Amino acid sequence: MIEDDMMNYTDDGVPESVFNAFGWDDPVVTTIAAGHINQTFRVALGERNQHLCVLQRVNPIFGPAVHYDIDAVTCHLQSRGLVTPRLIRTTKDELWFLDEFGALWRAMTWVDGENHTSAESPELCYEAGKLVAGFHLAVRDFKYKFRNERLGVHDITAHLKRLAEALDEKDYHRLYGEVAPLAEEVQNRLGKLPSLEGLPSRIVHGDLKISNLMFSPEGEGVCLIDLDTLAYMSVPVELGDAFRSWCNPTGESSADSEFSTGHYAEALRGYVAGGGSWISAEEIEAIPTGIETITLELSARFLTDALLESYFNWDRKNFSGAGEHNLYRAKSQLSLARSLSGKRDELRNITQEIFTRGD
């Protein structure tokens, strides 16, 4: 039976039915290693392989309905003159294809550019901020009800509840002695931060790690990719998650993370230069809090996952278990949160100065 199933796959692990669904003859398929969620391929078509597109096997955490959202938002972005990948319909005029094995596939137009795994320089942060501001500005007045709702993604109360439950249920876990005091610190720090509730809910990308931004070879922002996470959210939460990632030069895999105010200032300058100054005064004021809140939220989530041994991308080469890897990630984020805590006044001053001056 296994041999029969494999007969339907190409050398790249793509069922022939997928190529047929999109009407592709003799495609040249190359695996793109970047990304942990969806399996991504570069497809070259035509006699000289001159026509390129992206093919993705969509992770089961996303249902087919997400493609209605991607199509609607990218259509709007295109109408506003922004560069964006667009979904390619099947020969049956559908936005996705479900293969005979139950896997969900989609194809998208190819956008020339490159991405980065980390923000190596303040200059890159400037271009990233400018690109994100253009996106936020373009969807500012777009009225749309998402079919794929991402509920509880940044629900701090829910994440802390899960952490408390994990501590109660896993007190026998080999890492409990290390996790418990860190969890207490996370809870105490979060309890002292201003609430982000009540801020305007706006359409956002939802996952602005630097690898989800495309740049030209000259370093200019081109477009946002990986649009499965489109949702309504507050801008300080969106930017908080972005700046948490961009402004950590040591990378998220470092145990001793330090927040770079230089990277932050350039990211904000880029955001303002890209048209981001339209957000409200309360949103501007909440940006530094958003960074610290999301950093602590991730710490809580990783501590929970350490006790639950939950990590689909566990690095078996460097960690003896998923728990150990998650504990390392939690320590990295908590280190970053401590750095942020010590720079609150500086971050607040930088934020107000840049938005006031409009630079």
Predicted feature descriptions by range:
Residues T31-G46, Q50-C53, V58-K161, V235, ...:
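Conserved ATP-binding subdomain of kinase catalytic cores across diverse folds
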Residues E100, L124, P200, H205, ...:
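Secondary-structure capping and boundary motifs in well-ordered enzyme cores
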Residues I2-T30:
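Juxta-kinase regulatory segment immediately upstream of eukaryotic protein kinase catalytic domains
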Residues I284-I294, S320:
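Small/polar glycine-rich anion-binding or flexible loop at a beta-alpha turn
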Residues P236-S277, T293-N313:
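Active-site activation/catalytic loop segments of kinase-like enzymes and analogous catalytic loops
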Residues H36-Q50, V54-L55, L87, N188-V237, ...:
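Active-site acidic catalytic loop and adjacent metal/ATP-binding pocket
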